[in-house]
């Protein structure tokens, strides 16, 4: 059991809680397969405690870096099989929160829907939170988020539909959630991207004073990131790339607003993307359109390739 041919079957709230508790106990499930056999109703859980935990990186005066001993990665393969998680209250008390808070380098979450009966809420002053994952170093594939983001916590930053911070691959994902109340920076798919985002789509209405992007808030080249100083992650590609993505959602804000990306730093790459939706700027009108302009002086025209913007 637990193989690709005979995965562990998850069919109930109890199974989800068991997986969450086991990962919290330090079991990463590297190479182990899980598969949903039906929709999972989490309504009997007042607040689902998430799968995995990210406490960040630690260092010493010698420049050595390591993962916090509190980190708990999910390294297995979780196949939603086209089914949905329903009626969950996902309460982000800490940074880097989602249904899966930490998807490790070998982890895969795919074919999973977080439907509109789920509610994401948050403590004040948290960052990098999303319906599906807090931080991803692995692969998120063919997942859809439609959760309710109608909470009122203050100073919530890097709020996203799919993943708060991405170093891995996000492909074939869709956000349908509107984000118009809480949150100081918002995106449909990824909050901060150092990895690859492709063939993904935002359909949600995103509104904020600033830092609003249909696909990602920030697209970055992560050269020099502390994560790369840890042997297990030295081979990570941390050049932010966004390709074949579409924003269909209305976007509005005062500054750093983009149909695809709000801010493109340090030679992040964007290609074959489209923003057919009109987005609105107000007050200072400091907004960015593809492909001519971006907010952080990417000088090479090759950073934007074959993009279309009707805003």
Language model: regions and residue ranges:
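Surface-exposed repetitive/solenoidal architectures
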Residues: 1-311
